[in-house]
Regions:
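C-terminal "post-core" interaction segments
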Residues: 1-237
Length: 237
């Protein structure tokens, strides 16, 4: 399955595509699945979690530390007025219990405040399917952000082989929630991160592929994909 991005303007459509794929895998009894995140520059953690819900064979929570800085660019300030009111209403309903209460405390803190919140997400999907077969992940230097989190999870949970070249990030985590600003003097638009996501107790080391394979000049001129060729050889063996 090619995952070109975790960013989609149509969240429901994206999730339906993932649901459809794993429904077919389950129905046909497929025992080997390949996830290709080469060139996937990331997107929403919510969509990454949806993919993980299908391959989380050990049933563990997806744990991430979110390091926020309160600003006009954080995800709470970019919510619509209706969604912001809905968030406050839900938080006050359970306060001071639950993860949403920690988010509410951060939301009410002064601009410039920093806070670290541990999210422990219980992964689930509407089809209640957990694929437990062989799983392989393809990565390259343009696998970024949420793709880094996927690769880190893959290695940490020994979910399968990681094939290709190291992704753009380490086992320690990545950055997210991109915001666009325009520099005051030059008027040049830039995109910056407003959030750091860190895996629990991971060292700052690269995510080394199980099998390192990179394109050669000959591969490029012939339009050949060396990773796919390698997988074909494995299949024949």
């Amino acid at each position: 399955m090619g995952l070109k991005s975790f960013e989609s303007r149509r969240e429901r459509k994206y999730k339906r595509g993932i649901n459809s794929f794993f429904k077919k895998v389950d129905r046909k009894g497929i025992s080997k699945v390949i996830l290709d995140v080469r060139g996937n520059r990331g997107g929403y953690v919510l969509l990454l979690e949806h993919v993980l819900s299908y391959i989380n064979d050990k049933g563990e929570t997806f744990d991430l530390n979110y390091l926020y800085k309160r600003s006009k660019l954080d995800r709470f300030e970019t919510l619509s007025r209706f969604k912001k009111l809905d968030f406050v209403k839900k938080a006050l309903r359970v306060y001071p219990k639950g993860m949403i209460s920690k988010e509410y405390d951060f939301y009410k803190s002064p601009m410039g405040s920093m806070s670290s919140i541990l999210y422990q997400k219980k992964l689930s999907n509407p089809l209640d399917i957990t694929y437990t077969g062989e799983c392989t992940l393809l990565t390259n230097g343009l696998s970024m952000s949420a793709s880094v989190l996927l690769a880190s999870w893959f290695k940490d949970h020994n979910r399968g082989q990681v094939i290709g070249t190291p992704c753009f990030g380490s086992m320690q985590g990545t950055h997210g929630n991109a915001a666009r600003i325009v520099l005051e003097n030059s008027r040049i638009p830039i995109t910056i991160s407003t959030l750091k996501l860190s895996s629990i107790e991971q060292a700052l080391i690269e995510i080394t592929p199980t099998k390192k394979i990179q394109y050669s000049i000959k591969d490029l001129t012939m339009g050949r994909d060396p990773l796919i060729e390698y997988l074909k050889v494995l299949k024949n063996e």
